[in-house]
Amino acid sequence: MARAFLFVLDSFGVGGSPDATSYGDEGADTLGHIAEFCAAGAADREGLRSGPLSLPIMSGLGLLEIAKAATGRYPLGMPLPQKLYGLYGCANEISRGKDTPSGHWEIAGTPVTFDWGYFPTEGDAFPPELVEAICKAADLPGILGNCHASGTDIIARYGEEHIRSGKPICYTSSDSVFQIAAHEQHFGLERLISLCQIVRTLLDPYNIGRVIARPFIGETPANFERTGNRRDFSVLPPEPTLLDRLVAAERKVHAVGKIGDIFAHQGISRIIKANGNMKLMDATLKTMDEAADGDLVFTNFVDFDMVYGHRRDVAGYAAALEAFDARLPEVHRKLKPGDLLILTADHGCDPTWRGTDHTRERVPIIAYELGIRSRPIGIRQTYADIGETVAHHLGIAAGPHGRSFL
C-alpha cells in the first residue's frame, strides 16, 4: 500500500484529443509546440533559457513516447533516452468542459457529464439582474469589465478606475467562471474574498463552476501585478470523488496548492498553501516527509497554466518545465518502497495557440514506483483511470468510473 503522490502539471497537454475539433482546438499540442519553438530558437530568452527543450527526467519516464502515442510524432529537438523507467501513457477527457474542475474531478474518478453554464461572448457578459443582485448584496457602487478578457489585460485597462471608484473588475472567459479582480490595499483582500463568497451563492442558479478572486497590487498599469492570494470558490463535485473515498476509509488527503479550492474543500484532510511552482515543490517535498502509509499527497502546479499558458509565454512555459524536471530527483529521493508517483495534467493550454484560453488535448500519465518494470499503458479512455489506479494502489474499493492500469 505505502503512499501515493499525484502531481498535476496544470495545462501540460500532449495534443491529439479526438474531439478537439468540437472545441476549435484541432492541432493544439502544448508539449509539441513548445518543443517546436524551442528547437527553432523561438523560445530563447536572455537570462532565462535557450536551445531545445530539455526534460531529461520526464523523458526517461516516457514523456516522449507519450507524445508519440498522443499525436503520432516525437517532440522536435528532444533526444530519445537510452532507457525508460516506469509506466507511461496518455488519457482522453470524457468530461464536457476543458476547465480545471472538470479535469481534476475526472482525475479523481468523477467525470463531469453535465454541461456547465457559460456567459455570452458578445455584449455584456453578465445579465443585468445578476449585476444588480451582486451590487445590492455586497453594497457596491457598480462593477467594471463585464466582459470576456485576459486577467492581466483587464487589470491594466481598468485598474486605475477601480482604485478611484471602488468598483471591482468582473470578467469571464471561455470557462465556466466568474472572476473578480480587486486591489489588495485599496479594495481589501478580505473584502474581495467576502465578495466572492456572495457571488458564489448568487451564481448557483446559473450553474457556473467557479468564482475566482484575483487580487493585485500596484498603482499604475506599469506596475500592476497579481499577487499569490488567489482563491477559487468551486461548486461541489456531483458525486463522491477519490478524495471522499479515501477520507471515508480513514486515510489522509494532503492538498497542496489550489487542490483544496478545486474540490470545494470536500474530501480534504489537510491544506498546504504555497505560491509559485518552486515553493509548491518545496511544500510537496516537506509533505512527502510527513505523509503516512495509506495517504495521498495531491499537488497542483499552477504556474504552467496561470503564468505561462494563458499569457501565451512559450519561453516562460519551457523554462518552468525545465525547472520542474530538474527537481524530480529530489522527489525520487523521498520515495519509499511501495510508494506510487503519478505525473499528469488536467487539460491543455498551448502557449502558441490563438486566444488565451485552455485547449482540448490528451494529458500525459507517468507512473513510477521504485523497481517497477517500464511498460506503456496505452491511451486511456478517461482521466478517471488515474484516480482508480490510486484507489487500487492504496487498497480502497473501486469507484464507478475508470479502471486501474496497475
Curated annotation (Swiss-Prot):
GO molecular function, one term: phosphopentomutase activity
Entry-linked Gene3D superfamilies: Alkaline Phosphatase, subunit A, Phosphopentomutase
Binding site for Mn(2+) 1: 10, 346-347
Pathways involved: Carbohydrate degradation; 2-deoxy-D-ribose 1-phosphate degradation; D-glyceraldehyde 3-phosphate and acetaldehyde from 2-deoxy-alpha-D-ribose 1-phosphate: step 1/2
SUPFAM superfamilies associated with the record: Alkaline phosphatase-like, DeoB insert domain-like
Keywords of this entry: Cytoplasm, Isomerase, Manganese, Metal-binding
Ranges in coiled-coil conformation: none
A Pfam family: Metalloenzyme
GO biological processes: 2-deoxyribose 1-phosphate catabolic process; 5-phosphoribose 1-diphosphate biosynthetic process; metabolic compound salvage; nucleotide metabolic process
Entry cofactors: Mn(2+)
Catalysed conversion reaction: 2-deoxy-alpha-D-ribose 1-phosphate = 2-deoxy-D-ribose 5-phosphate; alpha-D-ribose 1-phosphate = D-ribose 5-phosphate
Signal peptide residue numbers: none
Superkingdom to which the source organism belongs: Bacteria
Keyword Cytoplasm: yes
Subcellular location as annotated: Cytoplasm
Cellular component per GO, a single term: cytosol
Family: Belongs to the phosphopentomutase family.
Family annotation (NCBIfam families): deoB, PRK05362.1
Chain's role: Isomerase that catalyzes the conversion of deoxy-ribose 1-phosphate (dRib-1-P) and ribose 1-phosphate (Rib-1-P) to deoxy-ribose 5-phosphate (dRib-5-P) and ribose 5-phosphate (Rib-5-P), respectively.
Name listed for the protein in its UniProt record: Phosphopentomutase
Organism in which the protein naturally occurs: Rhizobium rhizogenes (strain K84 / ATCC BAA-868) (Agrobacterium radiobacter)
